[in-house]
C-alpha cells in the first residue's frame, strides 16, 4: 500500500458513487508512465499500472509513437505492416486502448497527438518514413511533455533507462525526452524512476514458468543481456494482485505479443519465450527514497510522497 492509501481508497469509493471535489483530486496519488510504442506500457510496467489503479491512484500513460514499424505476429493482420498497407499504427491505437482498459486506465495519450512522430524502427532498419521520433526536435518534444507534467502534476514519473531497456532508438529517445521534460517542467516531480528488469526476478520467473508452447524458442535468464543485478535496483512492486490484468492487456496487443494459454509466459515476433514475472523493478533517478526492505529496495513507488 502506498502513503495515504486509506485516503485514496475512501476517495475512490466516494467517486464511484458520484461524489467528487477539488480537494479530493489534490489528495489522489498521480503516476505518469512515458513509453515509446503501444505494448511497451504493458510489457514493462503493466502490472505496476494496474496495481496502483486498483488502489485508487490516477494513472496516465503517454505514448510517443504509434508503433508503425512493428513486426506483425500471425497472418490475420500481416497486410497492415509497413511494407504492405502501412496501416499498423492506426490499428495499434485500438490495441493500446483495449490494453489500457484492461489495466484500468481510461484512454491513451500520445505525445503531440496520434501520429505526430513516427516509430523509428530498429537501429539497423532504413528510415522509410518521416518524421521519425528519433529525429524529433528535443526542445519541441520535451516542451510538449513538460506541459503534460505541469497539467497533470504527477507524484511519480516512470520511463526507461539511458539504454532504453534493450537499445531501441525510440526507447533511448523516450528516456532523453522524459529526462529533459522533468528538468524543464515547472512542476517539481517528487520521484522519477526508470523501469528495468531484474536478473534475479527474471530468474525466479523462468524457474516457475510451465507449459511453454512447443513452437517457442526456450532460453535461460543468462541469455537475456539487458538485466539489472540486485545492487543496481532501488524499488520493486509486487504485482501479483494485478497479474491477470497485465496478461489481459498483453492479449489485447495481439499483433505484437503472443501469450501462452496458461498466462505464465509470452513471446514477441522473435518467438523467444519469456516468463511473465509477478514483480516489476525500478531505479530511483531523483527524489527522496521511502522506507526500504532488507534488500535495500523500496516496495512502493509512492513511499515517502506527501500527497497534500
Curated annotation (Swiss-Prot):
Homology family: Belongs to the MshB deacetylase family.
Co-factor(s): Zn(2+)
Entries under Pfam families matching the protein: PIG-L
EC identifiers of the protein: 3.5.1.103
Biological process terms in GO annotation: mycothiol biosynthetic process
Species per Swiss-Prot/TrEMBL record: Mycobacterium sp. (strain JLS)
Known role: Catalyzes the deacetylation of 1D-myo-inositol 2-acetamido-2-deoxy-alpha-D-glucopyranoside (GlcNAc-Ins) in the mycothiol biosynthesis pathway.
InterPro entries: GlcNAc_PI_deacetylase-related, LmbE-like_dom_sf, Mycothiol_biosynthesis_MshB
Disulphide-bridged cysteine pairs: none
UniProt GO MF annotations: N-acetylglucosaminylinositol deacetylase activity; zinc ion binding
Positions contributing to Zn(2+) binding: 37, 40, 171
Keywords linked to the UniProt accession: Hydrolase, Metal-binding, Zinc
Keyword field contains Hydrolase: yes
Cofactor comment text: Binds 1 zinc ion per subunit.
Enzyme class (EC, first level): hydrolase
Catalytic function, reaction form: 1D-myo-inositol 2-acetamido-2-deoxy-alpha-D-glucopyranoside + H2O = 1D-myo-inositol 2-amino-2-deoxy-alpha-D-glucopyranoside + acetate
Name under which the protein is recorded: 1D-myo-inositol 2-acetamido-2-deoxy-alpha-D-glucopyranoside deacetylase
Amino acid at each position: 500500500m502506498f502513503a495515504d492509501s486509506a485516503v485514496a481508497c475512501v476517495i475512490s469509493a466516494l467517486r464511484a458513487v458520484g461524489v467528487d471535489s477539488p480537494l479530493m483530486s489534490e489528495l489522489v496519488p498521480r503516476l505518469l508512465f512515458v513509453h515509446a510504442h503501444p505494448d511497451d506500457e504493458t510489457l514493462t510496467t503493466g502490472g505496476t499500472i494496474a496495481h496502483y489503479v486498483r488502489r485508487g491512484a490516477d494513472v496516465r500513460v503517454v505514448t510517443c509513437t504509434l508503433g508503425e514499424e512493428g513486426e506483425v505476429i500471425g497472418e490475420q493482420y500481416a497486410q497492415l505492416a509497413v511494407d504492405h498497407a502501412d496501416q499498423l499504427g492506426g490499428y495499434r491505437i485500438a490495441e493500446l486502448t483495449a490494453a489500457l482498459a484492461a489495466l484500468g486506465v481510461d484512454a491513451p495519450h500520445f505525445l503531440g497527438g496520434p501520429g505526430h512522430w513516427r516509430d523509428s524502427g530498429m537501429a539497423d532498419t532504413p528510415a522509410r518514413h518521416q518524421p521519425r521520433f528519433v529525429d524529433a526536435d528535443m526542445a519541441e518534444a520535451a516542451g510538449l511533455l513538460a506541459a503534460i507534467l505541469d497539467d497533470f502534476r504527477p507524484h511519480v514519473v516512470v520511463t526507461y533507462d539511458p539504454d532504453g531497456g534493450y537499445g531501441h532508438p525510440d526507447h533511448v529517445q523516450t528516456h532523453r525526452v522524459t529526462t529533459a521534460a522533468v528538468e524543464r517542467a515547472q512542476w517539481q516531480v517528487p520521484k522519477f524512476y526508470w523501469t528495468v528488469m531484474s536478473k534475479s526476478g527474471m530468474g525466479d520467473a523462468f524457474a516457475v514458468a510451465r507449459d511453454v508452447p512447443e513452437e517457442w524458442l526456450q532460453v535461460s535468464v543468462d541469455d537475456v543481456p539487458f538485466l539489472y543485478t540486485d545492487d543496481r535496483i532501488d524499488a520493486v512492486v509486487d504485482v501479483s494482485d494485478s497479474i491477470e490484468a497485465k496478461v489481459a492487456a498483453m492479449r489485447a496487443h495481439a499483433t505484437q505479443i503472443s501469450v501462452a494459454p496458461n498466462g505464465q509466459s509470452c513471446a514477441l515476433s522473435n518467438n523467444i519465450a519469456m516468463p511473465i514475472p509477478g514483480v516489476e523493478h525500478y531505479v530511483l533517478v531523483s527524489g527522496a527514497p521511502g522506507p526500504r526492505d532488507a534488500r535495500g529496495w523500496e516496495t512502493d513507488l509512492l513511499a515517502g510522497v506527501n500527497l497534500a
